[in-house]
């Protein structure tokens, strides 16, 4: 189980990313439309003004059961070992154990 403080920090980053998402997207569109380099630098400065934690690259996908940041399957939102336990307990419909 991940520490509660790390999970709360991740939730805070998600809120910041949602808050500044439109600002980042509009600034990127403006940069692509403007041909002059000096104007691009001005808009680039505006693009760097939001907080660092509002960047989408700083977000992790976490297991919603344990909060583990690594080995998380996108389809299920679970980490690998929790996914395996749930499949063995027949808690995930449609998921089967592989056998060959």
UniProtKB/Swiss-Prot annotation:
Keyword rRNA-binding: yes
Keywords: Chloroplast, Plastid, Ribonucleoprotein, Ribosomal protein, RNA-binding, rRNA-binding
PROSITE patterns for the chain: RIBOSOMAL_S14
UniProt key word Ribonucleoprotein: yes
GO cellular component, one term: small ribosomal subunit
Disulphide bond pairs: none
A Gene Ontology BP annotation from the UniProt entry: translation
Cross-referenced Pfam families: Ribosomal_S14
Any GO molecular function: structural constituent of ribosome
Alphabetical list of HAMAP family matching this protein: Ribosomal_uS14_1
PANTHER family found in the cross-reference section: 30S RIBOSOMAL PROTEIN S14, SMALL RIBOSOMAL SUBUNIT PROTEIN US14M
Task of the protein: Binds 16S rRNA, required for the assembly of 30S particles.
Subunit structure, interactors included: Part of the 30S ribosomal subunit.
Family: Belongs to the universal ribosomal protein uS14 family.
Protein name as it appears in the record: Small ribosomal subunit protein uS14c
Organism, as annotated: Aethionema cordifolium (Lebanon stonecress)
Gene that encodes it: rps14
